[in-house]
Amino acid sequence: MHLRLISWLFIILNFMEYIGSQNASRGRRQRRMHPNVSQGCQGGCATCSDYNGCLSCKPRLFFALERIGMKQIGVCLSSCPSGYYGTRYPDINKCTKCKADCDTCFNKNFCTKCKSGFYLHLGKCLDNCPEGLEANNHTMECVSIVHCEVSEWNPWSPCTKKGKTCGFKRGTETRVREIIQHPSAKGNLCPPTNETRKCTVQRKKCQKGERGKKGRERKRKKPNKGESKEAIPDSKSLESSKEIPEQRENKQQQKKRKVQDKQKSVSVSTVH
């Protein structure tokens, strides 16, 4: 009877030892799969189990649940991972998941970075930016609309024509201004940055090499004093050259008649 009890006790002890070795090997496999799990309550874990990992953490560390396959295990971290925010309680410091549209957050109601397709505005993730704001597709934030800003006009340039400041009566002058702030996508466009207007060139003699083309042409066309009268025909000769031959004959006949009439009048006076 005593021998039978001893044998049963021996069998039970061996069976318990076998179960313990299986659990230990399973815990080692889980720790190899996830390096953040503290091994045997070492590192950040205050209390732990081989199956569930950390159950509580040492002071100032955050407790978080991480999924491995179909189960979750407890880990102790110095800071919460991306997509989680840390909350400190008297008995535990806990990592809590951010909202579904938030990539990183400061707390439950304040997001610091949104997921793709959303724009950040005052800690919230929005599909579209509010009125008066526009979306910045680089930072994925709602920003203020920026309008164009320009500087004051520079002084007018000297009055010139064809690059010359003399030799002409009329010319043009220009002035410019610079763009200080370029507009954003919805901002007001920039006004013109240059202006041109007509002006009067100052009366002054052109220095050598500054005379305009018209001045040089006038100088070449100007006739000499001696040949001015000979070269230019008078108005009477021009009129006579334009007359038709029949008109010339009529004028000559009229002159002859006048001469004959004068002769007759002279002869009559002598007879009396």
Swiss-Prot record:
SUPFAM superfamilies: Growth factor receptor domain (SSF57184), TSP-1 type 1 repeat (SSF82895). Ubiquitously expressed. Expressed at higher level in placenta, small intestine, fetal thymus and lymph node. Highly expressed in endothelial cells. Glycans are attached at residue 36. GO terms for biological process: blood vessel remodeling; branching involved in labyrinthine layer morphogenesis; canonical Wnt signaling pathway; positive regulation of canonical Wnt signaling pathway; positive regulation of non-canonical Wnt signaling pathway; positive regulation of Wnt signaling pathway; positive regulation of Wnt signaling pathway, planar cell polarity pathway; sprouting angiogenesis. It is found in: Secreted. InterPro entries: Furin_repeat, Growth_fac_rcpt_cys_sf, R-spondin, Rspo_Fu-CRD_dom, TSP1_rpt, TSP1_rpt_sf, TSP1_spondin_dom. Residues 147-207 form the TSP type-1 domain. Residues 1-21 form the signal peptide. CDD domains: FU. Residues 224-252 have a biased composition (Basic and acidic residues). Disulfide bonds join 41-48, 45-54, 57-76, 80-95, 98-105, 102-111, 114-125, 129-142, 148-190, 159-166, 199-206. Belongs to the R-spondin family. This is R-spondin-3. It comes from Homo sapiens. The gene is RSPO3.
